[in-house]
Amino acid sequence: MTRLLLLARACLQGLMCAPAALTAAPPTGLMTDLIEHTDRVWINGYPTQMTLEEAARSIEPVQMALIYNRRPMFSWVLNDVRPDVKQTFAQIQVGTSREQLSRYRSDMWNARFENNDNSTTVIYDGEPLKPNTVYYWKVRTDNNNAQQDWSEIRAFRTADTLYDYKTAYYPQVKSDERPVSVGRLPGGDLAVDFGRASFGQLVLTLDAQQADTIIVRIGEALRDGRLDRKPDGTIRYREHKLALLPGRHTYRIKIMPDTRNTRNTPPLAVPMPEYVGEVLPFRYLEIEGYKHDIAPADIERQTVHYPFNDFAVHFTSSDTVLNRVWELCRYSVKATSFAGIYVDGDRERIPYEADALLNQLCHYSVDREFTLARRSHEYLLNHATWPTEWILQSVLIAWYDYLYTGDIRSAEANYSLLKHKTLSALEEEDGLIVVLNNPKVDSALRDSIRLPQNQKLDDIVDWPRGEFTFMPKNISPNVFHYASLELMGKLAGAMGKKADSAAYASQAARTAASINKYFFDKKSGLYRDGIGTDHVSVYSNMFPIVFSLVPPQYQPRIADYLVSRGMDCSVYAAQFLLD
């Protein structure tokens, strides 16, 4: 799915989409700890006009993105679209007064960076920041040694407690939406369509001559032109009786919690914040017993999501189907961000590492802000799920986080935990890991990888599980074990941990050699599912080729095999198949 979005990345990162006049401009898109709108204040999920200073005097509960780090990181968009231009100098000023900073007076930090092209990971190194304090900063650059104007001033507020490292994040917010169509069904019921589904709440403005009762039905799916009242699986449907008051009134349809996705026992469901309230995914609405006319303006869906820039990227092609697929991918990232952490949808509202990996890669392609991916990753580091491969994928997520942000701080802060996530404790002499009936899968191991004691560690391969023959030692977890070792070596190198980097590289090489020795069948030219079976599958062959484990002379045979099988896997595994 994410590969459909690759064409948008260049525009997203400011590398293409230049205006007609190739000119320089002051830096824009200023971020503090990867948050752009640090100066924005919300009330109950809606943006306000308040400044950070005014928010401290508000009688209503307010929400904002706080900065938790003693030494936050600054970044900006160079905003110079002329060819062959690079930043050659930067100056940052940080102060406690907007007025003073506008006069180029900075009482916290005034840093000059000569011969420097870093515009993404500049770490604060001024006077100690205080908790619960508003600060201001701005930046200017020289591009090809030509001085540019100062940026606008950006404000941020520190949290009540400051840390050596803690990820900043936005509150969940609301967007009000109106239906795309309103009509009557045979029999007179109102039928409303919002055009696409979202996680939200419903507000209706209705008229009544006298006290009356109507039935409001909301859901995700239609059957024979009507709302499906008994949908399959975890497709949602709700029915509410609403007592009307005489006159014209606005009613909020209260969404009640579902015990299937609001449990507070491990594995924990991610709760909705009190200022937002409970939500339900729905697209369609039916109202029974309401005889008055109703305008689209009287029907409001309050969609809940993580802050998202709908105009950060643009994609179009001559293929209308491809355009629709791209828009589906883009919108899905926004729509499924309702919990403030990547979750599995409304089924359990639980994060899973594999889901987070796919969400992460897709999200990177459709917006400029990456804190939702990082926050989800760090949550999962401490709330692991049961599949062997998905625990190993924590290291992949950490690597992509560093690759796309250039910010190594999250990996540094979680380095010890990431080391455990490689599952090196389960390695045998050949460098391969095995989970089934392994006495090393004990309470100490579960604690080390943050897996609940009541959870069984088990190989998954795919979900739903496809055509794969499970053995005690399977290729799928071992390929991801190799990938985690290789990427831990790269992360260690980025941190300057040379000895660790070399050790992980050596460990990865041993595992790679064993994968090719024990799983590859020279007779068929394909990789087996596990040691002890001759069965081969899409999974056992696509995972090795994705992570460059296949020697060049065997790649054509495996490629032909994968093409012959088509999309013989789930949406999750399709990510790797497309890779």
Q: Model-derived features: where do they sit?
A:
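Active-site core of glycosidic bond-cleaving carbohydrate-active enzymes
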Residues: P351-L358, C362-D579
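Second-shell loop/turn segments in exported
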Residues: F311-S318, D346, C362, M471
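Extracellular/oxidizing-compartment recognition motifs
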Residues: A25-V134, K138-A339, D355, T371-L372, ...
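N-terminal short leaders/motifs
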Residues: R223-L244, I341-D346, L491-G496, F519-G530
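Glycine/proline-enriched, intrinsically flexible loops and inter-domain linkers
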Residues: E99-Q100, G345-P351
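Flexible glycine/proline-enriched surface loops and loop-helix/loop-strand junctions
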Residues: L268-A269, G340-G345, P464-T469
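Bacterial Sec-dependent N-terminal signal peptides
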Residues: M1-P26
